Amino acid sequence: MPRPIEALIHAEALTHNLARARAAVPDARVWAVVKAHAYGHGIARVFEALRAADGFALLDLAEAQQLRDLGWRGPILLLEGVFEPRDLELCSRLNLWHTVHCEAQIDWLAMHKTHQPHRVFLKMNSGMNRLGFRPAAFRAAWTRLHALPQVDEISLMSHFSDADGGRGIAAAMQVFDDATRDLPGERSLCNSAATLRHGADAAVRADWVRAGIMLYGSAPDFPSHDIAHWDLQPTMTLRARLIGTQDLQAGDTVGYGSRFTAEAPMRIGVVACGYADGYPRHAPSGTPVLVDGVRTRLVGRVSMDMVTVDLGGLPQAARGSEVTLWGRASSGAVLPIDEVAHAAGTVGYEPMCALAARVPVRLDAAG
């Protein structure tokens, strides 16, 4: 038999989370962000569940081609734009909208020969200091683009650095508003955190929001708020089985480095999942896990192919018992990926995207 581990992608949860994005910004359009292999879920698996979105946003031309091959004829936005001049040919052929964040991309457009003008999203660096034109240079970039026959419509966009935290978005909004006040074009500002926390403000939600991590059942501002607060549902479950048990005496240690020591007699279970499956290697003892739908904890260091869990209070647990590393147990109990990631010192995005190729993935169309 195959190794007892699998990941499930819950289609109904994806559809529910997209509906939550729409509810937060009822008069704006929603990009479903499917970059990074749809946050580890797989574009082909999430497409049908998310096709009610107004458009799909991603980074990779191959992923854009995949969406067209799946039958999507609506807008596709390249969030980082093109990486070399010849990419513009594929943008023309696939009818892709693309971000412009630097002078080189404008130069390439000026040299591009096309009969189909491009729809571009001009990006401002409003304080994130990754991609985008600084406010003082933004208007000149817009003027250059506006003069090009290769460019049709110019939308204006930025990305908040602190929409999920206490610093908030007021300063970035002021920078953006000051630099774009009399420029025409649609606006796109909100990521998931801004959509949920600030979407009630018409100026913030603007014309397009970019819903990413919220679609996949992770709270963008965890631990300030969890998925229950935002009415989001887990879309990925990582599930394995117990493949063995051990009875420990007080003083016995567990795993590499003897990081866990039993303080009293206890029983532990060995789970067919490790960091080679995408489980966070730095998850410490105490990280939550579900065994037969009951919450318990990790004990000892995460190994390549195994983790060990506390079976105290679980007398029925035995070889073959279901272990939910994150997501939804067969019993209906839920362990949000955010809790696991937080215990491991990271965020929910990372274990989603780190799901290993060796883990079989199954689409749960009914869940």
Swiss-Prot record:
Pathways per UniProt: Amino-acid biosynthesis; D-alanine biosynthesis; D-alanine from L-alanine: step 1/1
A Gene Ontology biological process term: D-alanine biosynthetic process
InterPro entries cross-referenced by the UniProt entry: Ala_racemase (IPR000821), Ala_racemase/Decarboxylase_C (IPR009006), Ala_racemase_C (IPR011079), Ala_racemase_N (IPR001608), PLP-binding_barrel (IPR029066)
In-chain residues carrying the UniProt-annotated modification N6-(pyridoxal phosphate)lysine: K35
EC number: 5.1.1.1
Cofactor: pyridoxal 5'-phosphate
Catalytic machinery residues: K35, Y256
Domain of life (superkingdom): Bacteria
Catalytic activity of the protein: L-alanine = D-alanine
Entry GO terms, CC: cytosol
Alphabetically ordered keywords of this record: Isomerase, Pyridoxal phosphate
Binding residues annotated for substrate, in chain numbering: R130, M304
SMART domains: Ala_racemase_C (SM01005)
Pfam families (alphabetical): Ala_racemase_C, Ala_racemase_N
Keyword Manganese applies: no
Keyword Iron-sulfur: no
Summary of the function given for this chain in its UniProt record: Catalyzes the interconversion of L-alanine and D-alanine. May also act on other amino acids.
Family in the record: Belongs to the alanine racemase family.
HAMAP family per UniProt: Ala_racemase
NCBIfam families from the UniProt entry: alr
Annotated protein name in UniProt: Alanine racemase
Species the sequence originates in: Methylibium petroleiphilum (strain ATCC BAA-1232 / LMG 22953 / PM1)
